[in-house]
Amino acid sequence: QRTDRSTPPPMRVPHSLKTTPFHARTARLVQGQTWRRWSGYAAASCYEFTHDREYAAIRSAAALIDVSPLFKYRITGADATRLLDRVVTRDVSKARPGQVLYTSWCDGHGKVIDDGTVCRLGEQDYRLTSAEPSLRWLHRNAFGMQVAIEEISEALGALALQGPTSARLLAAVSD
């Protein structure tokens, strides 16, 4: 954590914007105090004055990103696997509990609607993340199935560790 006097004060978030669970800790690290709206949240545009080092880190090493503004859905029930296998491009039935799959989903003509992750939490228990709201679309595709779909976006903060050295870094800090 930086403590020099050149660190700007954290942004005052307008009342109309929410903050992520990580905002209080990371807001002072945003050097230019440049923010953007993301799904109703105040999100850092970049932490340094330019994107150069952040881009290089995610392409050649690792970067930790606050992705709390993503939409998150809990999908449970006897047909949860069947629903997800219907709507995403990955074979969700092959995922093990605790495994996360990156995937996309398409409309009836094969056009990509969105992408995100599916985490298998249990036998018929999943969490799906997406950049765009997908609740209505999920319900339409679940018609006639034994499945419960719950939006849990505001209940969970989320961090994404990405980059070619991310698995090694995670293993080093989690053992």
What is each model feature region?
Residues 2-106, 111:
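Acidic, proline/glycine-enriched N-terminal capping motif
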